[in-house]
């Protein structure tokens, strides 16, 4: 996934106060190719230790090698090296492995069809839509999944503006349902009277 190197940079920046945090990168891509790409990448901060593992993204035994139960958080990106990659299958196996553990899982969906279903069934899942996500939002979600969208939208000075309006289509919906209704804007609050 093209976002992975930016995510590594963001993780390194977010963990400057840690002594060499470890990131495990698991992909269907061969391990030697992942190492080559890492060596050629422009990761700004070498203060993180990156371990690469290759395997089947849908196989529980192979995912168990990652020791996800001890992770601070997990990011599941769309794996472009796998033909017909199915993030839903990977998330189901991940959920099985993490059954009783409260590890935040940030998942990058290509479409929003299953975002609502997965969000309602797993409180530790933070889904992001591939068409509207930046690597920094994905990484910032590790730190605080409730406000990361808001903070980064404010910090991004690319001409975005804030509008206040009474959107009738959002009346009576939860915050999560509102976010799914309006994919081209960032909702950062709902006013109730």
Predicted regions and their residues:
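Cytosolic regulatory regions of ion transport systems
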Residues: 1-193
């Amino acid at each position: 996934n093209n976002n992975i190197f930016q995510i590594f940079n963001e993780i390194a920046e977010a963990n400057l106060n840690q002594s060499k945090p470890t990131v495990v990168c698991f992909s269907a891509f061969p391990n030697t190719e992942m190492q080559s790409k890492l060596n050629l990448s422009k990761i700004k901060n070498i203060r993180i230790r990156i371990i690469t593992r290759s395997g089947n993204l849908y196989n529980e035994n192979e995912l168990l090698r990652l020791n996800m139960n001890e992770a601070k958080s997990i990011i599941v990106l769309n794996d472009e090296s796998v033909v017909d990659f199915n993030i839903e299958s990977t998330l189901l196996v991940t959920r099985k492995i993490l059954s009783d553990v409260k590890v935040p899982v940030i998942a990058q969906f290509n479409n929003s069809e299953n975002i609502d279903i997965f969000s309602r069934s797993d409180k530790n899942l933070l889904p992001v839509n591939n068409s509207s996500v930046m690597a920094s939002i994905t990484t910032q979600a590790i730190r605080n999944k409730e406000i990361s969208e808001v903070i980064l939208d404010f910090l991004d000075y690319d001409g975005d503006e804030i509008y206040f309006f009474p959107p009738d289509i959002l009346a009576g919906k939860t915050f999560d349902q509102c976010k799914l209704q309006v994919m081209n804007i960032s909702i950062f609050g709902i006013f109730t009277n």
